[in-house]
Amino acid sequence: MKLPHELGPIHFIGIGGIGMSGIAEVLINLGYSVQGSDAAENANVLRLRRKGAIIHIGHRADNLGDAEVVVVSTAIKRNNPELAYARELRLPVVRRAEMLAELMRLKQCVAIAGTHGKTTTTSLVATLLEAGGFDPTVINGGIINAYGTNSRLGAGDWMVVEADESDGTFLKLPADVAIITNIDPEHLDHFGTFENIRKAFRSFVENIPFYGFAVMCLDHPTVQELVGQIEDRRVITYGENPHADVRLVDIDLAGGMSRFSVVVRDRKSGGETVIEKILMPMPGLHNALNATAAIAVAHQLGMSPDQIRGALAGFGGVKRRFTRTGEWNGAIVFDDYAHHPVEIAAVLKAARASTKGRVIAIVQPHRYTRLHSLFNEFAACFNDADAVIVADVYPAGEAPIEGADRDGLVAAIKARGHRLAMPLARPADLSRLVRQLARPGDYIVLLGAGNITQWAYALPGELAASAA
């Protein structure tokens, strides 16, 4: 039985979240009655209201109204008054991933998983399939600039979704095609150990049907190890690795663009298809690899090299992924969501390759537990930045952990030989510090998953005002 159209109002608790809002928007577009609540208004709430959703600010039992189904994310606590009342009424309570899975059962699905790069890769797959005439439905974990939203309802048979591994619920998703970009230690608060993370990703791949396939990055050692463990399912590998089925070659990352070619090897015939002179307006080796994963899917679905080249040349990017927010005195300011050491290092490497000037990194560590568990990795991930400014940790509701803080990270970065790392005493000091450091041609990159994005958009104006 598939998701019936006769459902009464579907109530989302925390509807403004990036994952919840995308599912809610697709349900609205399918004709379902959607309502919800959130702790505060945001752009997602306003967008859903414009589409007809009734959304309350604050959580109260009477917000449920005539709801017949309640959708919650793992961020919602058991004592939430709406959740408690729903259970008192014996209403069905559905986890976010379960509702996503119900939508996926209506289509053939590509699900993109990995510790990093999911959102960009999801956007790239969506862009390619749209250009190929597949008219896909898309549910992403970030705002796709071309859509102005994180979801779209297509009339075609395919759906493209970001598979969030953070709470393990990605194992509920019925994917026909699975992409794994990488596997690194993350979300240890849920998984406990890295071994448990590896096991979860193996299950994710093994869950695909026999007629599906997995696309896996051979450049990443943990993913490469997993490739060797998968039996009885079709695997297509990609990367710079010379043994990859879909190989990234001839890479030029200068000038804020990615130029490369891709060689697709047919295992049965031994023949090769070369997709030459691909240009993508997005910098960084990590993004070229994300594009290669998307190309692997597009090629399998029969898209031509010209279709692939055209789609990637017009790729509009994803909000908060190396997003330019402004310029001051010839220095360019960027906003990026990177909040894990691997992500930060990749973004700074891309910045280094894109400018002849210097790279100034401003980081707001996200969660004390993450900084504590990956402290040595954080201390070593800023090598491509000429200067590092470290803000206070964005707690995301967590209690402080001794030593895992702003000053501790600054000291650790310096101890590993970095010549210019400094603390940010308060956000109001940021423009003054940047004015002292920045020169024409420099890239100023603000990094983090907290409210540092607001600083990134305010900084160009503050720099201009302080210069007046």
Swiss-Prot record:
Gene: murC
GO molecular function list: ATP binding; UDP-N-acetylmuramate-L-alanine ligase activity
Enzyme Commission number(s) from the entry: 6.3.2.8
Name of the protein: UDP-N-acetylmuramate--L-alanine ligase
Keyword Cell division (UniProt): yes
Function, in words: Cell wall formation.
Pathway: Cell wall biogenesis; peptidoglycan biosynthesis
NCBIfam families the record matches: murC
The entry's keywords: ATP-binding, Cell cycle, Cell division, Cell shape, Cell wall biogenesis/degradation, Cytoplasm, Ligase, Nucleotide-binding, Peptidoglycan synthesis
Localization (cell): Cytoplasm
GO cellular component: cytoplasm
Gene Ontology biological-process entries: cell division; cell wall organization; peptidoglycan biosynthetic process; regulation of cell shape
InterPro entries: Mur-like_cat_sf (IPR036565), Mur_ligase_C (IPR004101), Mur_ligase_C_dom_sf (IPR036615), Mur_ligase_cen (IPR013221), Mur_ligase_N (IPR000713), MurCDEF_pg_biosynth (IPR050061), UDP-N-AcMur_Ala_ligase_MurC (IPR005758)
Source species of the chain: Methylocella silvestris (strain DSM 15510 / CIP 108128 / LMG 27833 / NCIMB 13906 / BL2)
Family of this protein: Belongs to the MurCDEF family.
Substrates-to-products reaction catalysed: UDP-N-acetyl-alpha-D-muramate + L-alanine + ATP = UDP-N-acetyl-alpha-D-muramoyl-L-alanine + ADP + phosphate + H(+)
Binding-site positions, ATP: G114, T115, H116, G117, K118, T119, T120
Entry superkingdom: Bacteria
